[in-house]
Amino acid sequence: MKIGITCYPTYGGSGAVATELGIALARRGHEIHFITYAQPFRLPAFLPRIYFHEVDVGRYPLFEYPPYDLALSVRMHEVVLDHGLDLLHCHYAIPHATSAWIAKEMLRPTRPDIRVVTTLHGTDITIVGQDPSFRAITKFSIEKSDALTAVSRYLQTETLTTFGCTACRIDCGQ
């Protein structure tokens, strides 16, 4: 398979998990495309079947805060089309799964088969997702994902309870 992985590239658990997963999948013969604003800290300079696509956020005087989520959506769209990806695997519901949903909508006329898998890591559900400013978009992004995984049984239960995602099936590998 050809898989796009989006994660925070900085030091932290979710970036490490996403990068190690990508490396392991590449060793099994899959083609992995990391799509993020910087090379993940755990990703060596070169590995077979692994590619890095930088998201250029750009700086415009109109925007006080650069719209990373929109730039990410466009970059995901480009990489899917240019490299024939089969799925986008997002680590964190917002902004990554949100951006993937936008990219998927943009791809609908030419690539209606693209799928989005979202892995929930914790902070996106227990802190950010419960902030009233982000609650609705977090729930939306979870529900629009084609598949969901969580890093623990606790997080699986917390997501279902907190967001009331009755139609969601969340795999936690246990």
Put a short name on every predicted segment.
Residues 40, 95, 154-156:
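Alpha-helix capping/helix-boundary segments
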Residues 56, 118, 138-174:
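Donor nucleotide-sugar binding/catalytic pocket of nucleotide-sugar-dependent glycosyltransferases
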Residues 107-117, 123-141, 157:
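Nucleotide-sugar donor phosphate/pyrophosphate-binding loop at the beta->alpha transition
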